[in-house]
Curated annotation (Swiss-Prot):
Coiled coil: none annotated. Induction: Expressed late during infection in a Rev-dependent manner. This is Virion infectivity factor. Residues 171-172 are annotated as: Membrane association.
Length: 192
């Protein structure tokens, strides 16, 4: 019988970013208790040798599984040391891969308080509203003018440590164009 290949999207991520993300997940699971129902699977609990960890996030009758890998082939740059992240949405026997932005939105639908557009209606009706959104990563668009006006009145409280964002985990911070210093800056960068 020949080998059967399964292709999946794995986002290349440096190991320090993965370590930070894992510790944020564990902090909010065990200390702050904001990630209720989340399940963390260690590398030694997996049968796959390249799986570094898995985080299972229940979303109603479905779940989001964020798998971190190690020992993959290195990427284009030296610092891509074979670390990666796959994001999968599962419901019963069906599963599909999702991008980091959608993963954050799905998490935000089920977890963490939000100062959402429904707060505008409640504020107009005189009801008390939640003063802030705890999970800004779950929003990918600019709100309405009313929403922006109300949000400007209330300064968001910084959560320490921040909530774990899948989009932030997979963000490519290495391949952004570098800004060189001006004339008084580094002379090796501008050729003088």
């Amino acid at each position: 019988m020949e080998n059967r290949w399964q292709v999946m999207i794995v986002w290349q991520v440096d190991r320090m970013r993965i370590r930070t993300w894992k510790s944020l997940v564990k902090h909010h699971m065990y200390i702050s208790k904001k990630a209720k129902g989340w399940f963390y699977r260690h590398h030694y609990e997996s049968t796959h040798p390249r799986v570094s960890s898995e985080v299972h996030i229940p979303l109603g009758d479905a779940k989001l599984v964020i798998t971190t890998y190690w020992g993959l082939h290195t990427g284009e740059r030296e610092w891509h040391l074979g670390q990666g992240v796959a994001i999968e949405w599962r419901k019963k026997k069906y599963s599909t891969q999702v991008d980091p932005g959608l993963a954050d939105q799905l998490i935000h639908l089920h977890y963490f308080d939000c100062f959402s557009e429904s707060a505008i209606k409640n504020a107009i009706l005189g009801y008390r509203v939640s003063p802030r959104c705890e999970y800004q990563a779950g929003h990918n668009k600019v709100g309405s003018l009313q929403y922006l006006a109300l949000a400007a009145l209330i300064t968001p409280k910084k959560t320490k440590p921040p909530l774990p964002s899948v989009k932030k985990l997979t963000e490519d911070r290495w391949n952004k164009p570098q800004k060189t210093k001006g004339h008084r800056g580094s002379h090796t960068m501008n050729g003088h």
